[in-house]
């Protein structure tokens, strides 16, 4: 079934980036990319924020894995910022409960430095600050797969590290804890969300085997954006066609 008429292929011409439309639809394109990922990388995990894009990517990746690699487990990483919409937390909660026996689940609730615009006196806010438990916006989730200060296998974590560094160091720890083999983190970012996302995806210098949607983080650790050319309508079309669960906030 066609999800979109065209796949957007991003290429370089005369030192500038351009969009080139092809006859391949975005669903066919993401199947091809997932095949490439599963063939190229030993360790695969999805960064699942609880948003509509990462949720769609998680569902697509699981469908592909169940069909073609039934004996291979993927990881699912959720970075919990404590103060988030209740509907988002409910979606993350039911997703983890649904897939916990099929994947390696990692629900991370560690103190981290997050920039805040809500204070005139502090530059950073620290979700899950262990020194201010009485001020927590919500209670710590209580599941075996929750990573917090009392249960933290992440040897690359540093107390109150920047939120961006925490995500990167999770990738590094995932690689270390899985035999130091070639590892990729799948991100649900799309080029049409913003110029910043567009520029982030168009990697001219550190792409993997001429694929601009895969970028290097560390030695043998990569990040990939398999749905980079999907539109907002493609996301909802897929959710409808495949009857996927999604974050009702959207």
What are these model-predicted stretches?
Residues 5-234:
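ATP-dependent adenylation/nucleotidyltransferase module used to activate substrates
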Residues 226-250:
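Mid-to-C-terminal catalytic subdomains of enzymes
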């Amino acid at each position: 079934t066609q999800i979109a008429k065209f796949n957007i292929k991003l290429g370089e011409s005369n030192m500038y980036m351009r969009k080139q439309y092809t006859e391949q639809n975005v669903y066919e394109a993401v199947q091809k990319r997932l095949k490439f990922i599963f063939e190229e990388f030993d360790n695969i995990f999805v960064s699942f924020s609880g948003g509509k894009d990462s949720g769609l990517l998680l569902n697509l990746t699981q469908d592909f894995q169940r069909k073609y690699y039934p004996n291979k487990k993927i990881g699912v990483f959720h970075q919990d910022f404590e103060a988030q919409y209740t509907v988002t937390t409910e979606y993350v909660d039911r997703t983890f409960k649904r897939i916990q026996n099929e994947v390696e689940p990692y629900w991370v609730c560690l103190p981290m430095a997050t920039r805040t615009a809500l204070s005139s006196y502090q530059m950073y806010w620290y979700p899950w600050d262990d020194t201010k438990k009485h001020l927590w916006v919500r209670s710590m989730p209580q599941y075996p797969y929750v990573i917090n200060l009392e249960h933290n296998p992440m040897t690359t974590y540093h107390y109150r590290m920047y939120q961006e560094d925490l995500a990167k160091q999770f990738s590094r720890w995932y690689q270390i804890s899985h035999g130091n083999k070639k590892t990729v983190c799948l991100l649900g970012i799309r080029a049409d969300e913003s110029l910043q996302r567009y520029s982030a995806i168009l990697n001219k210098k550190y792409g993997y085997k001429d694929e601009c949607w895969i970028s290097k983080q560390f030695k043998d650790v990569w990040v990939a954006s398999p749905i980079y050319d999907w539109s907002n309508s493609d996301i909802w079309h897929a959710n409808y066609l495949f009857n996927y669960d999604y974050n009702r906030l959207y």
